[in-house]
Amino acid sequence: MKTPIDPDIVKKFITASGLKSVGLASIRELNRLVTNIEVASGVSFIRMEMGIPGFDPPQIAVEGEIEALQQGVGSKYPPFDGIPELKAGIASFVKNFLNINVAPEGCLPTVGSMQGCYLAMMVAGRRFEGRNKILFIDPGFPVNKIQARVLGLPFESFDVYDFRGARLEDKLRTYLEQGDIGAILYSNPNNPSWICFTDKELEIIGRLCTRYDVIALEDLAYFGMDFRKDYSQPGRPPYIPSVANFTDNYILLISSSKSFSLAGQRIGMTAISPVLFNSAGDNLEPWFGSNRFGYAYIFGGMYALSSGVCHSAQHGLARLLEAVNSGQYNFVEAVQEYGERARVMKKLFTDNGFRIVYDLDEDEPLADGFYFTVAYPGLTGEALVEELLYYGISGISLATTGSKRLEGIRACVSLTGKELFPELKARLVQFNQNHQ
């Protein structure tokens, strides 16, 4: 059976990797394996395994950072809860695009949104005695569960696929009624499935968080990237949906990596509800020196993790937020091509025997965006990941994300420009022919 990549090379590096199962490898492990096969074979892959921005960072952020470095900030420790202009910029950004009021004191940069999630779980899981468990609404970013394990926090999880709409309430109650959940973590839009929670679902999550005094950790890594609506105009509807409309128990975790293409600078944003920030817990002081939530979060939590986010990166992001908040820079328009890529790539897959796994938001077709999910008849997602390596195509198994849809894989569109579509099509045609 002829394949684009020499089978002997693929097998050699799979064996050398020592992985028990290629299809269950972590994103970073798979990324290293694919790179090794690429180098040895001389054949470039269609790289869909890792969510890496496919565009250059905005020039205004680059210039802001260069200017700050030229002014000498590189020799100075930054405020570890953020420079004042960035804190104010984050608060304005949340108001302009979510229509939610947060105070600058509750806004802080983190070393990427990944650190933001880690910090949020660390503090939320220790707010009350006996309520240290994290509930993950899956599928989700695999590393978040690793973070919970490292923190020593127990967790529960469920795949939301069969619990959309009103069914979500009963499912959440089965966990919350146990009385040991400290926080609920989910991403919206969702990584890996690209489902987007509806206002009905966010209202359920928010209302139950208030009822059971649980914190909603809302991972907005793909901020404004549900391209079915235009969320690009500051201070004007439609506003990006958020659980913050339905509860005061929220922490918003906003990435700069995808929406702003600033992945390399490792700077994310956290916005804490003013009510939560000024609240108290009975178990924070032993861990963070104070039972006051906001004080514990910053002076006990953030300070323990870092002496602050890169000083110049803070200035670059602050400059960018100023442009975004004023309407000078349209960040949604800058990344809208991801949606067009997804639309074309989905069709290339479905034209060649694949089907979309997560395909609906309740009764509405899923948006075209940064990720999509596919399956092929007769293969599990675990097997499909390995089989596609012989065709120079890489993705990750949904099994690694907490999904119960074990037949599927996640594909990221960011590194597949339009110039690669003919090659992707040819490889998928060959794959389908070889598996008839």
Task: For the regions a language model picked out, list residue spans one by one.
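Conserved core of the PLP fold type I
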Residues: 70-212, 217, 223-246, 426
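Conserved glycine-rich beta-strand-loop-beta hairpin in the small C-terminal domain of fold type I
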Residues: 311-314, 318, 331-346, 350, ...
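N-terminal small-domain helix-loop-helix segment of the aminotransferase-like
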Residues: 3-10, 17-115, 321-328, 434-436
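Short hydrophobic/aromatic beta-strand micro-patches
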Residues: 271, 373-375, 412-414
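AMP-binding (ANL) adenylation modules
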Residues: 54, 257, 361-364, 400-403
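PLP-dependent enzyme catalytic core of the Aspartate aminotransferase-like
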Residues: 2, 92, 96, 100-102, ...
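Helix C-cap/helix->beta junction micro-motif
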Residues: 41, 151, 211-212, 391, ...
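Conserved core segment of the aminotransferase class I/II
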Residues: 246-336, 432
